Amino acid sequence: MNTQIIAIANQKGGVGKTTTCANLGIGLAQAGKKVLLIDGDPQGSLTISLGNPRPDKLPFTLSDAMGRILMDEPLRPGEGILHHPEGVDLMPADIQLSGMEVSLVNAMSRETILRQYLDTLKGQYSHILIDCQPSLGMLTVNALAAANRVIIPVQAEYLPAKGLEQLLQTVNKVKRQINPKLQIDGILLTMVDNRTNFAKEIAALLRDTYGSKIKVFKTEISPSVKAKEASADGKSIYAHDPKGKVAEGYKNLTQEVMKLEKPVSYTHLTLPTT
């Protein structure tokens, strides 16, 4: 099985990474894909949003899995992986992952520990999605080193859009030095309130600035209280508000992402020179 590994990345918090990871993952599962979600954030936001309110009480999390790889200790197949009722699997995270990030600093092959772990799972899944932490630290570098694709959620505001350059430089550096297979699938505009001229202007600015170098998804995700309610209930937006705008948006995004998996679609997705 040719596993697609997609990192959902942006060093800015609050841009919809976790919501995108959960709902894109479940959207892919609804389309018949076998999906594993990886919570790559010590805050455990993805873990919590999928119905595990106390990540610290879980017996096995991503920090344990990476620790086994780091210490060259054996892993049982599927150890610690949880199953969500909406058809996706989850490798959860808790605050111990922040300690793992510190441990990685002086480790051999420190950028590839997550990749080595995912190599043990690849044949079991068609898609692995990684919810990256909101920083450009060693955990995010590990995610980019493990992935072959990146989706960048960006809130339709000036400052988050401005911060894109730093992330693109990091992606470019990882591609150049560690992972030549890494490609940017596209920029996803989130929390776009098309009732305001400001949001429309930011969306247009992003498309003008990056559209010739990087795909900007046609799909735009609207702001929604329902999405927050869904996370609080441990459900996807499809289960919580199936006929709402956000559910429609993530269904459309899922279709766009699957279309990119045809070989011809990578020809124009080149990284900008930095």
Where are these regions (language model features)?
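P-loop NTP-binding core
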Residues: 1-269
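A short, hydrophobic C-terminal helix/tail in secreted or cell-surface proteins
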Residues: 270-274
